[in-house]
């Protein structure tokens, strides 16, 4: 029982307290009867696939793998992991299997609109909800370190 609680604590510290996996966790929690069951399974998955000391990019890959192993729908799992990854990683390296879909026209329009005010911008198409999200890494939340994000819905 103590080892189980230690595993949940480790998962809470790594994945929940950082806030960097918010969308993935919200979706993952729906796949289990209790959030603690999800977190326990996640940390067990991490340990059995190379350990819990993970780089940011590798931790997003682990999250994706665990979501899929837990019965997640591929399109939705890809969506939430990609959203979390691009919200918090200005380098924008996506986990293996997650396809980058740059939205060049929307990025150029955004840069024209905010000419000289922003430089580090990424516009990405998200097929799950048919949206383009523009991430501005020049402007991050001082507490959460979350990039500013504007959502544009495709018609």
Give, region by region, the residue ranges found by the protein language model.
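Acidic/histidine-rich catalytic neighborhood
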Residues: 1
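Radical SAM enzyme core and accessory elements
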Residues: 11-155
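Conserved, mostly hydrophobic/aromatic
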Residues: 5
């Amino acid at each position: 029982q103590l080892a189980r609680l230690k595993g949940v604590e480790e998962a809470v510290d790594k994945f929940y307290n950082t806030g960097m996996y918010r969308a993935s966790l919200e979706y993952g929690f729906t796949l289990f009867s209790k959030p603690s069951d999800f977190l326990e399974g996640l940390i067990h998955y991490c340990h059995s696939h190379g350990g819990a000391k993970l780089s940011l990019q590798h931790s997003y890959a682990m999250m994706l793998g665990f979501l899929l192993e837990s019965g997640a729908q591929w399109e939705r799992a890809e969506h939430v992991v990609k959203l979390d990854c691009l919200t918090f990683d200005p380098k924008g390296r996506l986990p293996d299997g997650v396809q980058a879909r740059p939205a060049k026209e929307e990025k150029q329009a955004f840069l024209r609109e905010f000419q000289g005010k922003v430089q580090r911008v990424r516009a990405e198409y998200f097929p799950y909800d048919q949206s383009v999200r523009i991430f501005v890494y020049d402007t991050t939340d001082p507490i959460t370190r979350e990039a500013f994000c504007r959502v544009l819905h495709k018609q």
